[in-house]
Amino acid sequence: MGPLINRCKKILLPTTVPPATMRIWLLGGLLPFLLLLSGLQRPTEGSEVAIKIDFDFAPGSFDDQYQGCSKQVMEKLTQGDYFTKDIEAQKNYFRMWQKAHLAWLNQGKVLPQNMTTTHAVAILFYTLNSNVHSDFTRAMASVARTPQQYERSFHFKYLHYYLTSAIQLLRKDSIMENGTLCYEVHYRTKDVHFNAYTGATIRFGQFLSTSLLKEEAQEFGNQTLFTIFTCLGAPVQYFSLKKEVLIPPYELFKVINMSYHPRGDWLQLRSTGNLSTYNCQLLKASSKKCIPDPIAIASLSFLTSVIIFSKSRV
C-alpha cells in the first residue's frame, strides 16, 4: 500500500478512503492519551457515551519515524543546538535532564551497540518524569502539524528523535541477540472506557510505556486494561530498571478480543504494522525540497481520529 498522503502533489491516496474524522475528548480528563482508531463505529443518537465529539478537526499526532533521514536529522539537531532550545522552552527541564543523566552514569553500564549516552538519558528523562510525559504527549497531539508549526512551537524535537531512534536501535540489538521480535505487555488507564469492536485497527499516537509483568493487568477498578502484543516496541529495562517496553506512536494494532464490565474493561491487541503521517519533519521545516512521506504498512477501511485526555499509568 502506498503513502496515505502525498504532500508534494497534494493528492489523497487511496481515493476510496472516506474523509471521515472525529476528535473525542473525555470530560474531566487531565493527561492526554492519544489514540487513532480506524473502523470505530460512530455513536448513534441513543448511545450513552460520556464524551464530546467534534467532527471538524484532524488530530495531527506527530509520528515521525525519520525514515531515510535519521543521520541527517541527528546532525541538524546538533548543529542547530536544538537541545538548548527545547530545554530552555520548558520549566525545570534542564534540572530533570541533569538528574536523568546522573542516574544513567551512576548505573555504570556499557551502552548497547550503536546507542549514545543521549539515547540512554532520553529514555530515563521520559520514563522517570510524569510531567515530561504529559507535556510531551500533549505537544505531539497539537503543535507539530506543519513544518512551520513544528519548527516554531514543538519544543520536543530533541526528545522525540532520540526516543524514536532508541526504540529502533534497541529492537535491532534485541533481534541480533536473541531473535525476539514481539512482546506481550500490559497497560491500563484510569477512569477511561473505550468502545471498539473485534477486528478494529487501533494506534496509540504517543510513546506508550507498558509493563512486561502480567499482574499489572489484573487490578480491576473503573479502568480499561490492555493486553498488547507489540512487534515494534522495545524493552527499556536495561535503562529504567523496570520491566518496561516502550511502544512507538506509529505502531498499528488490531483488536482481537475484548470484554466489558461495570468496574473495568479489557482489550487484547495484536500488532499489525505501522502508520506515519509525518517523515523527516525537521528537514522539511528548513528546506523547500519535497521529502517523501513514509509508506504506511496497513489495510484501513477508514481512518478515524480520536484524542482522549485521561489519567493513565502502567
Curated annotation (Swiss-Prot):
<keyword id="KW-0449">Lipoprotein</keyword>
<feature type="binding site">
    <location>
        <position position="206"/>
    </location>
    <ligand>
        <name>NAD(+)</name>
    </ligand>
</feature>
<protein>
    <recommendedName>
        <fullName>Ecto-ADP-ribosyltransferase 4</fullName>
        <ecNumber>2.4.2.31</ecNumber>
    </recommendedName>
</protein>
<keyword id="KW-0095">Blood group antigen</keyword>
<dbReference type="GO" id="GO:0016779">
    <property type="term" value="F:nucleotidyltransferase activity"/>
</dbReference>
<keyword id="KW-0521">NADP</keyword>
<feature type="propeptide" description="Removed in mature form">
    <location>
        <begin position="286"/>
        <end position="314"/>
    </location>
</feature>
<feature type="binding site">
    <location>
        <position position="126"/>
    </location>
    <ligand>
        <name>NAD(+)</name>
    </ligand>
</feature>
<keyword id="KW-1003">Cell membrane</keyword>
<dbReference type="GO" id="GO:0005576">
    <property type="term" value="C:extracellular region"/>
</dbReference>
<keyword id="KW-0548">Nucleotidyltransferase</keyword>
<feature type="glycosylation site" description="N-linked (GlcNAc...) asparagine">
    <location>
        <position position="178"/>
    </location>
</feature>
<dbReference type="InterPro" id="IPR050999">
    <property type="entry name" value="ADP-ribosyltransferase_ARG"/>
</dbReference>
<feature type="glycosylation site" description="N-linked (GlcNAc...) asparagine">
    <location>
        <position position="222"/>
    </location>
</feature>
<dbReference type="Pfam" id="PF01129">
    <property type="entry name" value="ART"/>
</dbReference>
<keyword id="KW-0472">Membrane</keyword>
<keyword id="KW-0328">Glycosyltransferase</keyword>
<feature type="signal peptide">
    <location>
        <begin position="1"/>
        <end position="46"/>
    </location>
</feature>
<keyword id="KW-0732">Signal</keyword>
<feature type="glycosylation site" description="N-linked (GlcNAc...) asparagine">
    <location>
        <position position="257"/>
    </location>
</feature>
<dbReference type="InterPro" id="IPR000768">
    <property type="entry name" value="ART"/>
</dbReference>
<feature type="binding site">
    <location>
        <position position="240"/>
    </location>
    <ligand>
        <name>NAD(+)</name>
    </ligand>
</feature>
<comment type="similarity">
    <text>Belongs to the Arg-specific ADP-ribosyltransferase family.</text>
</comment>
<keyword id="KW-1015">Disulfide bond</keyword>
<keyword id="KW-0336">GPI-anchor</keyword>
<dbReference type="GO" id="GO:0098552">
    <property type="term" value="C:side of membrane"/>
</dbReference>
<feature type="glycosylation site" description="N-linked (GlcNAc...) asparagine">
    <location>
        <position position="274"/>
    </location>
</feature>
<feature type="lipid moiety-binding region" description="GPI-anchor amidated alanine">
    <location>
        <position position="285"/>
    </location>
</feature>
<feature type="domain" description="TR mART core">
    <location>
        <begin position="91"/>
        <end position="276"/>
    </location>
</feature>
<feature type="disulfide bond">
    <location>
        <begin position="69"/>
        <end position="280"/>
    </location>
</feature>
<feature type="disulfide bond">
    <location>
        <begin position="182"/>
        <end position="231"/>
    </location>
</feature>
<dbReference type="GO" id="GO:0006525">
    <property type="term" value="P:arginine metabolic process"/>
</dbReference>
<keyword id="KW-0520">NAD</keyword>
<keyword id="KW-0325">Glycoprotein</keyword>
<keyword id="KW-0808">Transferase</keyword>
<dbReference type="GO" id="GO:0106274">
    <property type="term" value="F:NAD+-protein-arginine ADP-ribosyltransferase activity"/>
</dbReference>
<dbReference type="GO" id="GO:0003950">
    <property type="term" value="F:NAD+ poly-ADP-ribosyltransferase activity"/>
</dbReference>
<feature type="glycosylation site" description="N-linked (GlcNAc...) asparagine">
    <location>
        <position position="114"/>
    </location>
</feature>
<dbReference type="GO" id="GO:0005886">
    <property type="term" value="C:plasma membrane"/>
</dbReference>
